[in-house]
Curated annotation (Swiss-Prot):
Involvement in disorder: Muscular dystrophy, limb-girdle, autosomal dominant 2: An autosomal dominant myopathy characterized by proximal muscle weakness primarily affecting the lower limbs, but also affecting the upper limbs in most patients. Affected individuals also have distal muscle weakness of the hands and lower leg muscles. The disease has generally a benign clinical course but some individuals with childhood or juvenile onset manifest severe widespread myopathy, leading to wheelchair dependency and respiratory insufficiency.
Organism of origin: Homo sapiens
GO biological process: protein import into nucleus
N-acetylmethionine modified-residue sites: M1
Gene for this chain: TNPO3
Record lineage: Eukaryota, Metazoa, Chordata, Craniata, Vertebrata
Subcellular location: Nucleus envelope; Cytoplasm
SUPFAM superfamilies, per database record: ARM repeat
GO cellular component annotations of the record: annulate lamellae; cytoplasm; cytosol; nuclear envelope; nucleoplasm
Function: Importin, which transports target proteins into the nucleus. Specifically mediates the nuclear import of splicing factor serine/arginine (SR) proteins, such as RBM4, SFRS1 and SFRS2, by recognizing phosphorylated SR domains. Also mediates the nuclear import of serine/arginine (SR) protein CPSF6, independently of CPSF6 phosphorylation. The nuclear import process is regulated by the small GTPase Ran that partitions between cytoplasm and nucleus in the predominantly GDP- and GTP-bound form, respectively.
Effect of R754A: Abolished interaction with SRSF1
Oligomeric and partner information: Interacts with (GTP-bound) Ran. Interacts with (phosphorylated) SFRS1 and SFRS2; leading to their nuclear import. Interacts with NUP62. Interacts with RBM4. Interacts with CPSF6, promoting its nuclear import. (Microbial infection) Interacts with the HIV-1 pre-integration complex (PIC), which is composed of viral genome, matrix protein, Vpr and integrase. Interacts with HIV-1 integrase protein; the interaction is direct.
Name of the featured protein: Transportin-3
Gene Ontology MF annotations: identical protein binding; nuclear import signal receptor activity; small GTPase binding
Length: 923
């Protein structure tokens, strides 16, 4: 919103429309207009005026939120001499509005906290606030709100205050932490039975624990700690207060993760949590699920904190295994949501025990894990009145999947075979109800693959028993037994006499709609593992493939079946493969031809993606072993299918989704036959370029990268592929030149640099000598700022591989030429690249991208270290040394230390470490 400042009346009207306009389009217009206002420089004055006038809750909330947002994102707009008056104004507003609405108080508290963090001239802000407001009981609630959000905002991603300022703030808050704790004690004394005040005290204390600035020796003997456990032990504590106290205890436990340096507090918390077992049982008896979940969170956090002690000194001191007993008590609760809270701890325990690899230690924990698995098997039971198959996508289905993953991770402590046999014996010896049988089969399916299939009579017996299950058993039992058979495909491979009965059992499932997809998945597994044995059944698989749509399968299951069929097809004799592949593809090709001949307006779906996906999976997994000189058996089939794919692509050229599936299908066709697809190269490239000039689908760039990968080393193809690249670059660059082109088209950036990288890998000299290399590199430099994981990764990989070409394979005859060409490119753009990479790291990209950036800088250094040293020095000179408010972002010593660390690095990871530390100064 540029230009004149809008009137307050206009702002009020927009706020009213946002909240009360019955027309959604009116709300949308108001929201857009107010968003523009918030981004403008007028927002400061307008929001201040709205807060002074206090006309209604809505306008005050908008103004408070705007103030917070402006301070977080646009603080640089204000002159330094206005900061003190802004602070005083905000403190006046929060005092005047303290009774209007809690959400307004929170927004203003955040604004004050964010201001304090960015205002180095406001020294000792905690002391100032406490002195100003602690003696007025009516001001205590908003004072506590400010003191709660202040530590939370220190690590806020919205504020780029830098590591130096952050360190200064944390030291300042640590210095005043005892003042805050004393204030909280005073609040407790004044609160009496005021529950809301107690909740605010606990929230504030938890916030300071989370920042890690409270003195643990001081806190170990503090009355606040005793009060927390007193509240949690009392049966009459309300749900809200209980949650606040639980959150605070969890924060305290998290804060003492380094147990040895916080021993007195660790001991107090440890003893305190152990006293909560009785209170947990009382909550269970009262069926108070909220409190039960809170206790389980506390018990889990206790175990997480003392994990090292539990593993290293089980049963001794802070390794006391009563902690695990508490979690197993929770695992016994009938609601599965309770045990689910502890899953992360059990994963971590399994991980630690796996690394210790100590049989004696493992033996201590075995009984605990067995009890956990029995509890989990019980939690996995469906309701006795459940009808049909188990749901996999609802909350309970997702819980069962997480159980399956956890069991796989912990089974080594019990032993797969021992556990499998125990589970099977419960089915064999008893006559459990169907829901128990199904849950046991589900756990057996989770561990079946980890049981050694060699000469294992129990596995054989289980397989025999399952395939003989009568059709009268509950559908869910049949469903899970089919999944178990699929997981036991290794056993079938070792015992081929079971192949026929197993396939017969699965075929019955395939013919019933509820079981069809599970059966298809199991057949796919059998095909994958028993490829050689399944060759004799190929005709049966072909019959299934021909009538695929009659089986009522999910699209994924149908594709899985075709994948299995293709894997078996690849094991047939070479002379049979061409004919069989043609048969396998013919159903899909006929369907595509039928769609092509249809008039688009007759109401029937003309979407070819199902058939394209099926062809893609067939090409992807038909990978026979072909000796040099032999014609690829799939070549003829793919050449025959090409006209249909080409016509489909042409018909749907404007539809990105369908074109993407066409390209994917062609990609696997090319990969399938490799150099055998040479006859398609010319027509395919011509069609790609023609369509791309009109419709910039990025998948054409990706398909181009596949062609370069397959043919880039063929002398006769290089010029044609370069022509393709140059032709594709023209519309690509035009697309990226549009406003916000990079941000709006990350897929195009990703695929463009995949294509360019393939060129560097397969035919570097061709690209380096071309006219297009400098524009591509310039776009790569511009794209380094793009905060998109895949696109940024592709850009960095291109830059790394491009520069590496100047030093790689120095024994090859084109080495000197490559070295010279890279030298020319770097002379032209090296300084710009280094400056951009440094700026990008400090201001644009998240920390996870730093290893990729470090690799690029490392490669530049390998080409010419002295020149790189100069470039880096120039780049560092261009960085801001102070914030707009005068806080030191980076000192001269920090700059010189970083320069030295990078330029003297002997490994790439040292560059990465230096970057990590340095960029924190700007975050």
């Amino acid at each position: 919103m540029e230009g004149a400042k809008p009137t307050l009346q206009l702002v009020y009207q927009a706020v009213q429309a946002l909240y009360h306009d019955p027309d959604p389009s009116g709300k949308e217009r108001a929201s857009f207009w107010l968003g523009e206002l918030q981004r403008s420089v007028h927002a400061w004055e307008i929001s201040d005026q709205l807060l002074q006038i206090r006309q209604d809750v809505e306008s005050c909330y908008f103004a408070a939120q705007t103030m917070k947002m402006k301070i977080q994102t646009s603080f640089y707009e204000l002159p330094t001499d206005s900061h003190a008056s802004l602070r005083d104004s905000l403190l006046t507003h929060i005092q005047n509005l303290k009774d209007l609405s809690p959400v307004i108080v929170t927004q203003l508290a955040l604004a004050i906290a964010d201001l304090a963090l960015q205002m180095p001239s406001w020294k000792g802000c905690v002391q100032t606030l406490v002195e100003k407001y602690s003696n007025d009981v009516t001001s205590l609630p908003f004072l506590l709100e400010i003191l709660t959000v202040l530590p939370e905002e220190v690590h806020s991603r919205s504020l780029r205050i830098g590591a130096n300022r952050r360190t200064e703030i944390i030291e300042d808050l640590a210095f005043y932490s005892s003042t805050v704790v004393s204030l909280l004690m005073t609040c407790v004394e004044k609160a009496g039975t005021d529950e809301k005040m107690l909740m605010k005290v606990f929230r504030c204390l938890g916030s300071w624990f989370n920042l890690g600035v409270l003195d643990s020796n001081f806190m170990a003997n503090n009355k606040l700690l005793a009060l927390l456990f007193e509240v949690l032990q009392q049966d009459k504590t309300s749900s809200n207060l209980h949650e606040a106290a639980s959150d605070c205890v969890c924060s305290a436990l998290y804060a003492i993760e380094n147990v040895e340096t916080n021993l007195p507090l660790a001991m107090q918390l440890f003893q305190g949590v152990l006293t909560l077992e009785t209170a947990y049982h009382m909550a269970v008896a009262r069926e108070d699920l909220d409190k039960v979940l809170n206790y389980c969170r506390i018990f889990t956090e206790l175990c997480e904190t003392f994990l090292e002690k539990i593993v290293c000194t089980p049963g001794q001191g802070l390794g006391d295994l009563r902690t695990l007993e508490l979690l197993l008590i929770c695992a016994g609760h009938p609601q599965y949501e309770v045990v689910e809270i502890s899953f992360n701890f059990w994963y971590r325990l399994g991980e630690h025990l796996y690394k210790t690899n100590d049989e004696v230690i493992h033996g201590i924990f075995k009984a605990y894990i067995q009890r956990l698995l029995h509890a989990l098997a019980r939690h996995c039971q469906l309701e006795p009145d459940h009808e049909g198959v188990p749901e996999e996508t609802d909350d309970f289905g997702e819980f069962r999947m997480r159980v399956s993953d956890l069991v796989k991770d912990l089974i080594f402590l019990i032993g797969s075979m021992e556990c499998f046999a125990q589970l099977y014996s419960t089915l064999k010896e008893g006559n459990p109800p169907w829901e128990v049988t199904e849950a046991v089969l589900f756990i057996m399916a989770a561990i079946a693959k980890s049981v050694d299939p060699e000469n294992n009579p129990t596995l054989v017996e289980v397989l025999e028993g399952v395939v003989r299950l009568p059709e009268t058993v509950h559908t869910a039992v049949r469903y899970t037994s089919i999944e178990l058979v699929g997981e036991m495909s290794e056993v079938v491979d070792r015992n081929p006499q079971f192949l026929d009965p197993v396939l017969g059992y699965l075929m019955k499932g395939l013919c019933e709609k509820p079981l069809a997809s599970a059966a298809a998945k199991a057949i796919h597994n059998i095909c994958s593992v028993c490829r050689d044995h399944m060759a004799q059944h190929f005709n049966g698989l072909l019959e299934i493939a021909r009538s695929l749509d009659s089986f009522l399968l999910s699209p994924e299951a149908a594709v899985g079946l075709l994948k299995g069929t293709a894997l078996v097809l690849a094991r047939l004799p070479l002379d049979k493969i061409t004919e069989c592949l043609s048969e396998l593809c013919s159903v899909q090709v006929m369907a595509l031809k039928k769609l092509l001949s249809q008039e688009p307006s007759n109401g029937i779906s003309s979407d070819p993606t199902v058939f394209l996906d099926r062809l893609a999976v067939i090409f992807r997994h038909t990978n026979p072993i072909v000796e040099n000189g032999q014609t690829h058996p799939c070549q003829k089939v793919i050449q025959e299918i090409w006209p249909v794919l080409s016509e489909t692509l042409n018909k749907h050229r404007a539809d990105n989704r369908i074109v993407e599936r066409c390209c994917r299908c062609l990609r696997f066709a090319v990969r399938c036959v490799g150099k055998g697809s040479a006859a398609l190269l010319q027509p395919l490239v011509t069609q790609m370029v023609n369509v791309y000039h009109v419709h910039q689908h990025s998948c054409f760039l990706y398909l181009g990268s596949i062609l370069v990968d397959e043919y880039g080393m063929e002398e006769g193809c290089r010029q044609g592929l370069l022509d393709m690249l140059q032709a594709l670059c023209i519309p690509t660059f035009q697309l990226l030149e549009q406003q916000n082109g990079l941000q709006n088209h990350p897929d195009t950036v990703d695929d463009l640099f995949r294509l360019a990288t393939r060129f560097i890998q397969r035919s570097p000299v061709t690209l380096l000598r071309s006219q297009v290399v400098i524009p591509i590199l310039q776009w790569a430099i511009a794209s380094t700022t793009l905060d998109h994981r895949d696109a940024n990764c592709s850009v960095m990989r291109f830059l790394r591989d491009l520069i590496h070409t100047g030093v790689a394979n120095d024994h090859e005859e084109d080495f000197e030429l490559r070295k010279e060409l890279i030298g020319q490119v770097m002379n032209q753009l090296g300084q710009q690249l280094v400056s951009q990479l440094l700026h990008t790291c400090c201001f644009c990209l998240p920390p996870y991208t730093l290893p990729d950036v470090a690799e690029v800088l490392w490669e530049i250094m390998q080409v010419d270290r002295p020149t790189f040293c100069r470039w880096l020095e120039n780049s560092l000179k261009g960085l801001p040394k102070e914030t707009t408010v005068g806080a030191v972002t980076v000192t001269h010593k920090q700059l010189t230390d970083f320069h030295k660390q990078v330029t003297s690095a002997e490994e790439c990871k040292q560059v990465c470490w230096a970057l990590r530390d340095f960029t924190r100064l700007f975050r």
